[in-house]
Structures are given as C-alpha cells and as structure tokens.
A protein has these predicted regions:
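Rhodanese-like catalytic fold shared by cysteine-dependent sulfurtransferases
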Residues: 1-25, 32-65, 71-103
Length: 103
C-alpha cells in the first residue's frame, strides 16, 4: 500500500507563494499543446507520460517545493502519486488545476 505523501494547495495559496518569490518549482503535466496555449508563469512543462523519464532532472531541484498542476487536477494527482513512489516528499498538488488558478 502506498501512502500519499503530497499535500493539496489552493490557487490562492499558490498565488501567494509566487508573489512572495518562494523557492518553488512549478511543473505543468499537461500536453505540450495545452502548455503552449496557457500556463502559469515560471512553470516548466513535463507531460505526465514523460514524468518518470525526467526524474533525474527533478532530483536536481530537491531544495525546492514542487507544485504539480494540470487542467483540472486529475493528471496532477497521478503525477503526485508517481513522485511519491519515486521517493519525493516535498511536493504539492494544485487543487482544481489551472482552470481554477486563472479565475
């Protein structure tokens, strides 16, 4: 049994972190096409299906809080579970995704 080790973060909480220049890494797990249409400033795009192939890149940012997001929050939950299985423990899921963030 895998214990979920991520926390949910609201859009308002994320906006405060960004405004305060907190040491965070934003990862958008949507497709490249979705990312090009709209994204959260300073985020990087690692599509969900490529996430495990980029684990080493994420290890280089282990000093940062990682915030994972997608369109509505479903793919990001899957991504968070993958990160938990890989041993990450300092990351967050953006509740309701970029849809809620852009409201």
């Amino acid at each position: 049994m895998i214990l979920v080790s991520y926390k949910n973060i609201s859009s308002n909480e994320l906006k405060k972190l960004i405004k305060n220049n907190e040491n965070i890494l934003l990862i958008d797990v949507r497709s490249e096409e979705e990312f090009e249409e709209v994204n959260i400033e300073t985020s990087i795009n690692i599509p969900l299906q490529d996430l495990l192939y980029n684990i080493d890149e994420l290890q280089d940012h282990n000093d940062k809080d990682i915030v994972i997001y997608c369109r509505s929050g479903h793919r990001s939950i899957t991504a968070c579970n993958l990160l938990a299985m890989e041993g990450f423990n300092k990351f967050y899921n953006l509740e309701r995704g970029i849809i809620d963030y852009l409201k």
